[in-house]
Amino acid sequence: MSSSAIQVAKTATYLPDLVEVQRASFKWFLDEGLIEELDSFSPITDYTGKLELHFVGNEYRLKRPRHDVEEAKRRDATFASQMYVTCRLVNKETGEIKEQEVFIGELPLMTERGTFIINGAERVIVNQIVRSPGVYFKDEQDKNGRRTYNASVIPNRGAWLKFETDKNDLLHVRVDKTRKINAHVLMRAMGLSDNDVIDKLRHPEYYKKSIEAANEEGISSEDQALLELYKKLRPGEPPSVSGGQQLLQTRFFDPKRYDLGRVGRYKINKKLRLTIPDTVRTLTHEDVLSTLDYLINLELDVGGASLDDIDHLGNRRVRSVGELLQNQVRVGLNRLERIIKERMTVGETDSLTPAQLVNPKPLVAAVKEFFGSSQLSQFMDQTNPLAELTHKRRISALGPGGLTRERAGFAVRDIHPSHYGRLCPIETPEGPNAGLINSLATHARVNQYGFIETPFWKVENGRLIKEGDPIYLSADLEDECRVAPGDVATDADGQILAELIPVRYRQDFEKVPPEQVDYVQLSPVQVISVATSLIPFLEHDDANRALMGSNMQRQAVPLLRPERPLVGTGLETQVARDSGMVPISRVNGMVTFVDATAIIVRDEDGVDHTHYLQKYQRSNQDTCLNQRPIVCQGDPVIVGQVLADGSACEGGEIALGQNVLVAYMPWEGYNYEDAILVSERLVKDDLYTSVHIEKYEIEARQTKLGPEEITREIPNVAEESLGNLDEMGIIRIGAFVESGDILVGKVTPKGESDQPPEEKLLRAIFGEKARDVRDNSLRVPSTERGRVVDVRIYTREQGDELPPGANMVARVYVAQRRKIQVGDKMAGRHGNKGIISRILPREDMPFLPDGTPVDIVLNPLGVPSRMNVGQVFECLMGWAAANLDCRVKVVPFDEMYGAEKSQQTVEAYLKEAAKQPGKEWVYNPENPGKLQLIDGRSGEPFDQPVTVGYAQILKLVHLVDDKIHARSTGPYSLVTQQPLGGKAQQGGQRLGEMEVWALEAYGAAYTLQELLTVKSDDMQGRNEALNAIVKGKPIPRPGTPESFKVLMRELQSLGLDIAVYTDEGKEVDLMQDVNPRRSTPSRPTYESLGVADYDED
């Protein structure tokens, strides 16, 4: 297929760097965030005030990491750098200054791709969206339906302050949700006189009631106010004026305890129209008075005061890696401060050095805890390049300091008008996290304050100005402007053509003449996220299905031979490039060497730059990472040019699936309920074959009885089973293994106790010690097979870090090629998913008039009710493109080029394709878009014409091989003695309440009885049944299920006298062991507890 790509809809879409949000944030942390923390935390003085320790924050340095990225992955190490900072210890009494560079901990570094390597695994720090610090005004209804207003001052860290009005027109204040205090008490405690307050208010008459109320309570001076404040905030403690003063000081005016942050100061200044410099991060008297004034104006409905919408993106901000890491460093430094103060007190003042005072452990622990176990530090989704990119651009409302799933209501999850161009309205998970986890829109960026901005072109007097850089606006600023959508029609000069333009203004829609338009959106794609922007004809799909389409593209398995889509949207190249999966040239120059493992580019100065390629590496999701060069020796290259394709890429574009010939028609019921009928060609030609790499690991540990040994000498194993093992007992690379084969031979010493009787007998007769080791080898699990592609051995001698108690760790990587098969899940890009129900020989598939058999048959009933008609457009556009031998890029939302534009474009292309010689049958004017298909089995044409075309269909990661599972006998749960659940536990299928009802409805009493006893948790019964089946005897009657005994014990533990009786009223002791061969009962019975004697009385 020729690679000429036709751009159907021309819009200038220059996407920004898509991983910028991660990289910029980490750079900020290194340049500013870390220094800020080190500075804020020094000096540290001891309790006597003699010693001071200063950290010189801007003189910190990072050492070169011990391992590079690849080495860190291979050794299971962390890609991190050591932090050193200059410290000065000042002795106030002698004036002596000791200066020294001190190691304060290790800092994991971000890779070029925006990820972190922690213990050899690639992780991503997800961005968190939280409520911005600032002041918020809300209204509430009290019990009598009267509206009251309140104002909350929310800091970045520290106590919340909440002012409230009530039905008696009094003002109250709460500190951190404690009891209400008269607002004027707080004013007096802060040292403000009545006149100070009244002068600042525009409507002081409302406030005077609160002054009178305070006077009536007998609080007229600052001291009395401080006592009252202390009583309310610390009830039960003896109040004192100095205590009150200290409490107020530490709660709101101490920078270490209370911090509005740069953002909080900015928001408060903006809301209350103040001009306090942004270095003042604590509360000021002016803040409190202005808040009161605003609240009174709200209550009286004057002065243009307005309520805040907490779901507005102007009031929510994004915390990226840098800030989350900074918070964590602060936690570590606070712990360190305590340790330093203790050491200053304990140590000899004269001989102390900074290095003795500073212990790196608390900081290391805090950072490690964040990267290892924080909710926001996630194992990277590496299924394909798109999944990786989307993961880095994810924005979560969960996590520390955020919401919880249970508490989040509908309003938080809902789409808000301010999301426009900032958060994608479509891409979010289905299920409990819907709306709490979002994705950044394509053009959005996060500004210095953490608010999301989106770009616009300026409009002056109805003329669109596209010179220079677009203007980025945050949600707050955008509300004040009239913004037209990106698909307005303009003439060549940029003059807007329509007489009335729909614009968004203050979260509403109105129509205005072009002269009143302030800005125009940059591109139609800027509203949606990266994954959604890859869906062609998106505007014809229902949002629910587009959501599924976006999510399923992230689950597409990279195929053996990727093929880029015939119908794309023009963003495929950038997605592949920014995902970090494809190597990019760093210089302008010439390719001097290419092979499968490396590409060397010589720049204009004659310097060689080597790009090493990944070959068959295992991704986090067990898919295969492999890079193939696409440049040849002697090719000139420019900076930023793609040199090689990664997994799921072709020609530098993302290629998640295959373009296959699809027909929408029923076929013998095989595509009932979304099932999919596919041709054998997809299996034979390896169209949907993918490579999966599994990792198997075993460690040889030190046991009480001696060390475990990795060896070829395994007891009771035939020589042919050891054929592929080397002299150490480890499988050779390249061997083909099936389930049950030995990968690594290991023997464990066994003690006297775990020897079977026959072995004891042998030893008694011959006196020889049978080799007292047990086979504990690593074997291939059931249902798995494949070829060994890599073996890695880690020992302490080589300098590898091993888990405690382990002497050696061996890892074997096994690759398997998985062809498509019945039970695999496939999907299109429009949320049309299904399971393969049958693979037909190609001669039985319906075929086209020119004899080409169809590849996939989909059910036409899957389209109308789900309203994802985009798939039909894609399929027909693909059909035209395949016949014209080209590829097409369709930008979504094409109505700016005219009404019904998609339909016209597709039809025009189909007509164009039919003009080619011998291709007249491609377009049938009577049934546009449909063809007469012929039944492959009978050779007869079908009754009706059928929609046929090329669509991109993906194979998803939910493969039947990983899901299919059966159990005969296996492990049981300890308490209930029922079989475990799940494939990993070798579990059974649960026969639940509803299944029991079904059997009851049929009266299948015996079937039901054995399902609930012998096949489940009647311990003695199941052993006897197994015995009877093996010996061919009749199966004995079942006994009592163990879970019934557990229920009885639980009721007895509540103090209820519950027991089981026969018809004659005689008590049956279920707990007694019925097996006569074991004389000792397994559990204490009623008799042994002496209950029997008690009953006879």
Swiss-Prot record:
This enzyme's EC code(s): 2.7.7.6
GO cellular component: DNA-directed RNA polymerase complex
Catalytic reaction(s) noted: RNA(n) + a ribonucleoside 5'-triphosphate = RNA(n+1) + diphosphate
GO biological process per UniProt: DNA-templated transcription
Chain segments carrying region Disordered: 1072-1097
InterPro entries reported in the protein's UniProt record: DNA-dir_RNA_pol_bsu_ext_1_sf (IPR042107), DNA-dir_RNA_pol_bsu_external_1 (IPR019462), DNA-dir_RNA_pol_su2 (IPR015712), DNA-dir_RNAP_su2_dom (IPR007120), DNA-dir_RNAP_su2_hyb_sf (IPR037033), RNA_pol_bsu_bac (IPR010243), RNA_pol_bsu_CS (IPR007121), RNA_pol_bsu_protrusion (IPR007644)
Keywords assigned: DNA-directed RNA polymerase, Nucleotidyltransferase, Transcription, Transferase
Enzyme class, spelled out: transferase
CDD domains, alphabetized: RNA_pol_B_RPB2
GO molecular function, one term: ribonucleoside binding
Highest taxon listed in the record's lineage: Bacteria
UniProt record similarity statement: Belongs to the RNA polymerase beta chain family.
Quaternary structure and partners: In cyanobacteria the RNAP catalytic core is composed of 2 alpha, 1 beta, 1 beta', 1 gamma and 1 omega subunit. When a sigma factor is associated with the core the holoenzyme is formed, which can initiate transcription.
Function text: DNA-dependent RNA polymerase catalyzes the transcription of DNA into RNA using the four ribonucleoside triphosphates as substrates.
UniProt xrefs under PANTHER family: DNA-DIRECTED RNA POLYMERASE I SUBUNIT 2 (PTHR20856)
Protein name: DNA-directed RNA polymerase subunit beta
Source organism (scientific name): Prochlorococcus marinus (strain MIT 9303)
Highest classification ranks of the organism: Bacteria, Bacillati, Cyanobacteriota, Cyanophyceae, Synechococcales
Gene: rpoB
